[in-house]
Regions:
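Conserved glycine-rich cofactor-binding loop
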Residues: 13-15
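Short, small/polar-rich loop/turn modules that mediate ligand/substrate recognition or access, typified
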Residues: 174, 179, 246-248
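Substrate-binding pocket helix/loop in short-chain dehydrogenase/reductase
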Residues: 98-99, 106-111, 137, 216
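C-terminal substrate-recognition "lid" of short-chain dehydrogenase/reductases
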Residues: 81, 119-122, 134, 222-253, ...
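Alpha-helical segment proximal to the catalytic Tyr-Lys
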Residues: 127, 171-172, 244
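Residue(s) in the substrate-gating loop at a strand-loop-helix junction
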Residues: 142
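Active-site helix of classical SDR
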Residues: 122, 158, 166
Length: 260
């Protein structure tokens, strides 16, 4: 059982982030959700969490490219929920193209959302966690924090950066009751992955079906997508007392991808 009672999960209006938020809510944690999407859809998911798990579920529209909004989100969570026990940096976007065709503005946007946002959120949350002598920071990286794939220069660079940032902050807060870890999923059939299938097909000159079978699942010896529920269960475990000695870890959950 987790001793954490409150959690911020960025990028939690769909996909992996929503799965983690729901897994936390099932443990009785109150939540600060964050992400983009149709307001009606976001409100539907927020209310579903409240109704199903009987927890508080707030929503912040903070833009992960704007440091001040990220800081204000953390401050609001602390003020309205009473603490920030867990921070999950999950927000992420993707773009697929050869480097000579990669738009510089896409590079900047991916680095801002996939890497810098985690820095700004941790910078705001760590003092609050130090004050209560407890905290769990979970950065959602990727198998691409450990290996590379062509045509994903910004994403791979950002995820490798998340791995380094995770280790550095873990060392800084090791005696403060705070753990910092990165979860590195393989391919999960989320909206983010589904959106990149056509781009990958175009970049490689193959069909979308071939992308799924020969590119995505080819990397994973289990030949199946990792599930959101599996990632949520690992995230929950990292918040429990039994995970207190796990820190600075880069944890693969990738169907054997990085065992190659």
């Amino acid at each position: 059982m987790s001793e954490a009672r409150t959690a911020i999960v960025t990028g939690s209006t769909s996909g992996i982030g929503l799965g983690i938020a729901r897994a936390f809510a099932a443990q009785g944690m109150n939540l600060m959700l964050n992400g983009f999407g149709a307001p009606a859809d976001i409100e539907k998911e927020r209310q579903a969490i409240i109704d199903e798990f009987h927890v508080k579920a707030l929503y912040s529209p903070a833009d992960m490219t704007k440091p001040q909004e990220i800081t204000e989100m953390v401050t609001a969570a602390h003020a309205q929920l009473g603490a920030v026990d867990v921070l999950v940096n999950n927000a992420g976007i993707q773009f697929v193209a050869p480097i000579e065709e990669f738009p510089p503005e896409k590079w900047d946007q991916i680095l801002a959302i996939n890497l810098s946002a985690a820095f700004h959120a941790m910078r705001a949350a760590v003092p609050l966690m130090k004050a209560q002598k407890f905290g769990r920071i979970i950065n959602i990286a990727s198998a691409h924090a450990l290996v590379a794939s062509p045509f994903k220069s910004a994403y791979v660079a950002a995820k490798h950066g998340i791995a380094g940032l995770t280790k550095t902050v873990a060392l800084e807060v090791a005696e403060a009751g705070i753990t910092v870890n990165a979860i590195c999923p393989g391919y999960v059939l989320t909206p983010l992955v589904e959106k990149q299938i056509p781009d990958t097909a175009k970049a490689r000159g193959i069909t979308e079906a071939q992308v799924v079978h020969d590119v995505l699942l080819d990397a994973q010896p289990t030949k199946r997508f990792v599930t959101v529920e599996e990632i949520g269960a690992l995230a929950v475990f990292l918040t429990t007392p039994l995970a207190g000695s796990i820190t600075g870890a880069i944890l693969s959950i990738d169907g054997g991808w990085t065992a190659h």
